[in-house]
Amino acid sequence: MSETLNVCGLTIERGTKLRTYLPIPDTNVKIPLTIINGENDGPTLLITAGIHGGEYPGIAAAMELGRDIEPENVTGCLIMMHPVNIQGFWARREMIVPEDGKNLNRVFPGDPTVTLADKTAYLISNNFFPIADFYVDMHSGDIHESLHPYVYYPGQPTPEIEKKSRSVARVLDMEYMVRSLATGGAYNYAASTGLPSILIERGGAGLCLHEDIEAYKDDIRNILRKLKMFSLPVKPRHHSPRDVENLIYLEALETGCWLHHIHSGDFVEEGQVLGRITDVFGNTLTTYYAEQTGVILYVCPALASPKGTILVAYGTIKEFDDED
Protein backbone atom coordinates (compact mmCIF):
# COMPACT_ATOMS: atom_id res chain seq x y z
CA MET A 1 0.00 0.00 0.00
CA SER A 2 1.29 3.46 -0.86
CA GLU A 3 1.40 6.41 1.56
CA THR A 4 -1.89 7.72 0.14
CA LEU A 5 -4.94 5.67 -0.85
CA ASN A 6 -6.83 6.92 -3.89
CA VAL A 7 -10.15 5.27 -4.77
CA CYS A 8 -13.31 6.55 -6.48
CA GLY A 9 -12.06 10.13 -6.35
CA LEU A 10 -11.34 9.94 -2.62
CA THR A 11 -7.88 10.61 -1.19
CA ILE A 12 -7.00 9.19 2.22
CA GLU A 13 -3.61 10.09 3.63
CA ARG A 14 -1.51 7.73 5.75
CA GLY A 15 -2.54 7.91 9.43
CA THR A 16 -6.05 9.28 8.80
CA LYS A 17 -9.65 8.07 8.91
CA LEU A 18 -12.41 9.00 6.46
CA ARG A 19 -16.12 8.45 7.17
CA THR A 20 -18.25 9.52 4.24
CA TYR A 21 -20.80 8.46 1.64
CA LEU A 22 -19.76 6.76 -1.60
CA PRO A 23 -21.98 7.72 -4.58
CA ILE A 24 -23.06 4.94 -6.91
CA PRO A 25 -22.51 6.42 -10.39
CA ASP A 26 -25.59 7.43 -12.39
CA THR A 27 -27.89 7.04 -9.36
CA ASN A 28 -28.95 9.15 -6.39
CA VAL A 29 -27.81 6.44 -3.96
CA LYS A 30 -24.81 6.75 -1.63
CA ILE A 31 -23.22 3.98 0.46
CA PRO A 32 -21.86 4.71 3.96
CA LEU A 33 -18.10 4.17 3.82
CA THR A 34 -15.30 4.10 6.39
CA ILE A 35 -11.63 4.01 5.36
CA ILE A 36 -8.93 3.81 8.03
CA ASN A 37 -5.49 4.29 6.53
CA GLY A 38 -3.13 3.10 9.25
CA GLU A 39 0.03 4.83 10.35
CA ASN A 40 2.20 1.94 9.11
CA ASP A 41 2.38 0.13 5.79
CA GLY A 42 0.56 -3.20 5.50
CA PRO A 43 -2.25 -5.11 3.75
CA THR A 44 -5.63 -3.72 2.70
CA LEU A 45 -8.71 -5.44 4.15
CA LEU A 46 -12.05 -4.81 2.44
CA ILE A 47 -15.24 -5.48 4.42
CA THR A 48 -18.80 -5.29 3.10
CA ALA A 49 -21.81 -5.48 5.41
CA GLY A 50 -25.45 -5.33 4.42
CA ILE A 51 -25.32 -6.62 0.86
CA HIS A 52 -28.69 -7.89 2.08
CA GLY A 53 -30.29 -4.93 3.86
CA GLY A 54 -32.15 -6.98 6.49
CA GLU A 55 -29.07 -8.71 7.90
CA TYR A 56 -28.36 -6.40 10.79
CA PRO A 57 -25.59 -7.59 13.17
CA GLY A 58 -22.77 -7.26 10.63
CA ILE A 59 -23.96 -3.79 9.65
CA ALA A 60 -24.03 -2.61 13.26
CA ALA A 61 -20.63 -4.19 13.96
CA ALA A 62 -19.03 -2.47 10.96
CA MET A 63 -20.57 0.88 11.96
CA GLU A 64 -19.16 0.60 15.48
CA LEU A 65 -15.74 -0.68 14.42
CA GLY A 66 -15.45 2.22 11.99
CA ARG A 67 -16.25 4.60 14.81
CA ASP A 68 -13.90 3.04 17.38
CA ILE A 69 -10.78 1.91 15.49
CA GLU A 70 -8.17 4.62 15.05
CA PRO A 71 -5.34 4.80 12.47
CA GLU A 72 -2.66 4.39 15.16
CA ASN A 73 -4.01 0.89 15.86
CA VAL A 74 -3.95 -0.22 12.21
CA THR A 75 -1.08 -1.47 10.07
CA GLY A 76 -2.27 -1.19 6.49
CA CYS A 77 -5.70 -0.04 5.38
CA LEU A 78 -9.19 -1.04 6.53
CA ILE A 79 -12.11 -0.31 4.17
CA MET A 80 -15.69 -0.91 5.32
CA MET A 81 -19.07 -0.38 3.60
CA HIS A 82 -22.05 -0.40 5.98
CA PRO A 83 -24.62 -1.12 4.63
CA VAL A 84 -23.98 -1.72 0.94
CA ASN A 85 -27.68 -2.18 0.12
CA ILE A 86 -28.70 1.07 1.80
CA GLN A 87 -32.05 1.19 -0.01
CA GLY A 88 -33.01 -2.30 1.14
CA PHE A 89 -31.86 -1.42 4.65
CA TRP A 90 -34.14 1.61 5.01
CA ALA A 91 -37.04 -0.21 3.35
CA ARG A 92 -36.61 -3.20 5.71
CA ARG A 93 -36.65 -5.47 2.68
CA GLU A 94 -35.27 -8.96 2.80
CA MET A 95 -32.70 -10.07 0.24
CA ILE A 96 -33.36 -7.66 -2.63
CA VAL A 97 -32.60 -4.14 -3.82
CA PRO A 98 -36.08 -2.51 -3.80
CA GLU A 99 -35.54 -0.46 -6.98
CA ASP A 100 -34.99 -3.45 -9.26
CA GLY A 101 -36.00 -6.52 -7.22
CA LYS A 102 -32.57 -8.10 -7.67
CA ASN A 103 -30.51 -10.01 -5.13
CA LEU A 104 -27.34 -7.91 -5.07
CA ASN A 105 -25.22 -10.89 -4.07
CA ARG A 106 -26.21 -12.67 -7.27
CA VAL A 107 -25.21 -10.03 -9.81
CA PHE A 108 -21.44 -9.75 -9.24
CA PRO A 109 -19.30 -8.56 -10.99
CA GLY A 110 -22.10 -6.23 -12.01
CA ASP A 111 -22.60 -3.88 -14.94
CA PRO A 112 -22.46 -0.06 -14.90
CA THR A 113 -25.14 0.22 -17.61
CA VAL A 114 -27.98 -1.75 -16.01
CA THR A 115 -29.95 -1.24 -12.76
CA LEU A 116 -28.99 -0.23 -9.22
CA ALA A 117 -27.97 -3.70 -8.04
CA ASP A 118 -25.69 -4.20 -11.05
CA LYS A 119 -24.19 -0.72 -10.70
CA THR A 120 -23.49 -1.31 -7.01
CA ALA A 121 -21.79 -4.65 -7.67
CA TYR A 122 -19.72 -3.10 -10.46
CA LEU A 123 -18.61 -0.23 -8.23
CA ILE A 124 -17.28 -2.68 -5.65
CA SER A 125 -15.75 -5.26 -7.98
CA ASN A 126 -14.16 -2.73 -10.32
CA ASN A 127 -12.79 -0.25 -7.75
CA PHE A 128 -12.30 -2.07 -4.46
CA PHE A 129 -11.51 -5.72 -5.22
CA PRO A 130 -8.37 -4.73 -7.20
CA ILE A 131 -6.87 -2.76 -4.28
CA ALA A 132 -7.68 -5.28 -1.53
CA ASP A 133 -5.45 -8.06 -0.19
CA PHE A 134 -8.29 -9.83 1.64
CA TYR A 135 -12.10 -9.53 1.50
CA VAL A 136 -14.69 -10.26 4.20
CA ASP A 137 -18.41 -10.25 3.36
CA MET A 138 -20.50 -9.96 6.56
CA HIS A 139 -23.92 -11.64 6.46
CA SER A 140 -26.60 -12.91 8.82
CA GLY A 141 -29.74 -14.92 8.42
CA ASP A 142 -32.17 -12.64 6.61
CA ILE A 143 -35.50 -11.53 8.07
CA HIS A 144 -36.98 -15.01 7.46
CA GLU A 145 -33.81 -16.97 8.32
CA SER A 146 -32.44 -18.36 11.60
CA LEU A 147 -28.91 -19.74 11.58
CA HIS A 148 -26.08 -21.06 13.73
CA PRO A 149 -22.88 -19.01 13.25
CA TYR A 150 -20.60 -20.36 10.51
CA VAL A 151 -18.28 -19.16 7.75
CA TYR A 152 -17.88 -19.99 4.05
CA TYR A 153 -14.53 -20.04 2.30
CA PRO A 154 -14.16 -20.50 -1.47
CA GLY A 155 -13.23 -23.92 -2.80
CA GLN A 156 -13.39 -23.19 -6.53
CA PRO A 157 -10.36 -20.94 -7.19
CA THR A 158 -6.69 -21.92 -7.00
CA PRO A 159 -5.42 -24.05 -4.08
CA GLU A 160 -3.41 -21.03 -2.91
CA ILE A 161 -6.50 -18.78 -2.69
CA GLU A 162 -8.46 -21.52 -0.94
CA LYS A 163 -5.66 -22.07 1.58
CA LYS A 164 -5.32 -18.35 2.37
CA SER A 165 -9.07 -17.94 2.73
CA ARG A 166 -9.41 -21.01 4.95
CA SER A 167 -6.53 -19.94 7.18
CA VAL A 168 -8.41 -16.73 8.00
CA ALA A 169 -11.73 -18.55 8.45
CA ARG A 170 -10.06 -20.72 11.08
CA VAL A 171 -9.40 -17.77 13.44
CA LEU A 172 -13.10 -17.02 13.92
CA ASP A 173 -14.84 -17.88 17.18
CA MET A 174 -17.47 -20.22 15.72
CA GLU A 175 -17.99 -23.95 15.51
CA TYR A 176 -18.36 -24.55 11.78
CA MET A 177 -16.98 -23.58 8.39
CA VAL A 178 -18.04 -24.64 4.90
CA ARG A 179 -15.92 -25.03 1.77
CA SER A 180 -18.12 -23.49 -0.89
CA LEU A 181 -18.22 -25.01 -4.35
CA ALA A 182 -20.48 -22.25 -5.66
CA THR A 183 -19.25 -19.71 -8.19
CA GLY A 184 -21.80 -16.94 -7.56
CA GLY A 185 -21.83 -14.22 -4.94
CA ALA A 186 -19.50 -11.36 -4.09
CA TYR A 187 -16.87 -13.35 -2.21
CA ASN A 188 -16.74 -16.20 -4.72
CA TYR A 189 -16.35 -13.73 -7.57
CA ALA A 190 -13.62 -11.93 -5.63
CA ALA A 191 -11.81 -15.23 -5.12
CA SER A 192 -12.02 -15.96 -8.85
CA THR A 193 -10.07 -12.73 -9.46
CA GLY A 194 -7.30 -13.83 -7.08
CA LEU A 195 -8.57 -12.08 -3.94
CA PRO A 196 -8.73 -14.39 -0.86
CA SER A 197 -12.20 -14.03 0.64
CA ILE A 198 -14.67 -15.36 3.20
CA LEU A 199 -18.38 -14.92 3.90
CA ILE A 200 -19.38 -14.91 7.58
CA GLU A 201 -22.88 -15.81 8.78
CA ARG A 202 -23.82 -14.66 12.29
CA GLY A 203 -27.20 -13.68 13.77
CA GLY A 204 -30.44 -13.38 11.82
CA ALA A 205 -34.25 -13.48 11.80
CA GLY A 206 -34.45 -9.68 11.61
CA LEU A 207 -32.81 -9.29 15.03
CA CYS A 208 -29.88 -7.08 15.96
CA LEU A 209 -28.76 -8.55 19.28
CA HIS A 210 -25.96 -7.03 21.32
CA GLU A 211 -24.21 -10.38 21.69
CA ASP A 212 -24.17 -10.92 17.91
CA ILE A 213 -22.77 -7.45 17.30
CA GLU A 214 -20.02 -7.94 19.89
CA ALA A 215 -19.16 -11.41 18.55
CA TYR A 216 -18.95 -9.98 15.03
CA LYS A 217 -16.61 -7.22 16.23
CA ASP A 218 -14.39 -9.87 17.82
CA ASP A 219 -14.43 -11.77 14.51
CA ILE A 220 -13.11 -8.74 12.64
CA ARG A 221 -10.50 -8.02 15.30
CA ASN A 222 -9.30 -11.63 15.06
CA ILE A 223 -9.04 -11.29 11.29
CA LEU A 224 -7.08 -8.05 11.61
CA ARG A 225 -4.70 -9.78 14.02
CA LYS A 226 -4.33 -12.75 11.67
CA LEU A 227 -3.43 -10.38 8.82
CA LYS A 228 -0.95 -8.58 11.11
CA MET A 229 -2.96 -5.37 10.78
CA PHE A 230 -4.04 -4.80 14.38
CA SER A 231 -2.05 -3.85 17.46
CA LEU A 232 -4.72 -4.23 20.16
CA PRO A 233 -5.33 -7.51 22.06
CA VAL A 234 -8.31 -9.72 21.23
CA LYS A 235 -10.46 -11.87 23.48
CA PRO A 236 -9.65 -15.60 23.62
CA ARG A 237 -11.85 -17.83 21.46
CA HIS A 238 -14.29 -20.45 22.75
CA HIS A 239 -14.50 -22.35 19.45
CA SER A 240 -12.36 -23.25 16.45
CA PRO A 241 -14.31 -23.95 13.24
CA ARG A 242 -14.66 -27.51 11.95
CA ASP A 243 -15.56 -28.30 8.36
CA VAL A 244 -19.15 -29.17 7.51
CA GLU A 245 -19.50 -31.13 4.27
CA ASN A 246 -22.21 -32.64 2.07
CA LEU A 247 -24.58 -29.72 2.61
CA ILE A 248 -28.22 -30.33 1.81
CA TYR A 249 -30.40 -27.29 1.13
CA LEU A 250 -33.94 -28.61 1.60
CA GLU A 251 -36.48 -26.80 -0.57
CA ALA A 252 -40.25 -26.62 -0.08
CA LEU A 253 -41.96 -28.81 -2.65
CA GLU A 254 -45.16 -26.76 -2.54
CA THR A 255 -46.48 -23.51 -1.12
CA GLY A 256 -47.82 -23.93 2.39
CA CYS A 257 -47.26 -23.39 6.10
CA TRP A 258 -43.89 -24.60 7.43
CA LEU A 259 -43.74 -26.04 10.95
CA HIS A 260 -40.14 -26.89 11.83
CA HIS A 261 -39.31 -29.55 14.44
CA ILE A 262 -35.66 -28.59 14.79
CA HIS A 263 -33.57 -25.46 15.35
CA SER A 264 -30.29 -24.12 13.98
CA GLY A 265 -27.35 -25.71 15.77
CA ASP A 266 -29.24 -28.95 16.48
CA PHE A 267 -27.78 -32.34 15.65
CA VAL A 268 -30.09 -34.63 13.69
CA GLU A 269 -30.08 -38.33 12.89
CA GLU A 270 -30.83 -39.79 9.49
CA GLY A 271 -34.58 -40.34 9.24
CA GLN A 272 -35.45 -37.76 11.91
CA VAL A 273 -38.41 -35.47 11.19
CA LEU A 274 -37.20 -31.99 10.26
CA GLY A 275 -40.64 -30.45 9.88
CA ARG A 276 -43.80 -30.48 7.81
CA ILE A 277 -45.73 -28.33 5.38
CA THR A 278 -49.47 -27.94 5.96
CA ASP A 279 -52.23 -26.13 4.13
CA VAL A 280 -53.92 -23.13 5.75
CA PHE A 281 -56.40 -25.50 7.41
CA GLY A 282 -53.61 -27.35 9.23
CA ASN A 283 -53.69 -30.48 7.08
CA THR A 284 -50.24 -31.97 6.50
CA LEU A 285 -49.15 -31.88 2.87
CA THR A 286 -45.55 -33.09 3.19
CA THR A 287 -43.36 -34.29 6.05
CA TYR A 288 -39.62 -33.79 5.60
CA TYR A 289 -37.03 -36.20 7.02
CA ALA A 290 -33.27 -35.89 7.42
CA GLU A 291 -31.43 -37.66 4.61
CA GLN A 292 -28.23 -37.88 6.67
CA THR A 293 -26.92 -37.47 10.19
CA GLY A 294 -25.44 -34.02 10.75
CA VAL A 295 -25.76 -30.50 12.12
CA ILE A 296 -28.41 -27.91 11.26
CA LEU A 297 -26.80 -24.69 10.06
CA TYR A 298 -29.92 -22.88 8.97
CA VAL A 299 -33.70 -23.08 9.48
CA CYS A 300 -36.49 -21.00 8.00
CA PRO A 301 -38.49 -19.89 11.08
CA ALA A 302 -41.29 -18.32 9.04
CA LEU A 303 -44.71 -19.96 8.82
CA ALA A 304 -45.40 -18.77 5.27
CA SER A 305 -43.39 -20.92 2.88
CA PRO A 306 -43.71 -20.35 -0.87
CA LYS A 307 -42.64 -23.22 -3.11
CA GLY A 308 -38.85 -23.30 -3.46
CA THR A 309 -38.15 -21.76 -0.03
CA ILE A 310 -34.98 -23.13 1.58
CA LEU A 311 -36.46 -24.71 4.71
CA VAL A 312 -33.32 -26.24 6.23
CA ALA A 313 -29.60 -26.38 5.45
CA TYR A 314 -27.62 -29.15 7.13
CA GLY A 315 -24.46 -31.16 6.60
CA THR A 316 -22.07 -33.68 8.05
CA ILE A 317 -19.21 -32.67 10.32
CA LYS A 318 -15.83 -33.68 8.94
CA GLU A 319 -14.31 -36.20 11.34
CA PHE A 320 -10.70 -35.08 11.00
CA ASP A 321 -9.36 -31.62 10.22
CA ASP A 322 -6.63 -31.56 7.57
CA GLU A 323 -4.64 -29.09 9.67
CA ASP A 324 -5.12 -30.69 13.09
Report residues per predicted region.
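Structured catalytic-domain cores with a bias toward divalent-metal coordination
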Residues: 1-324
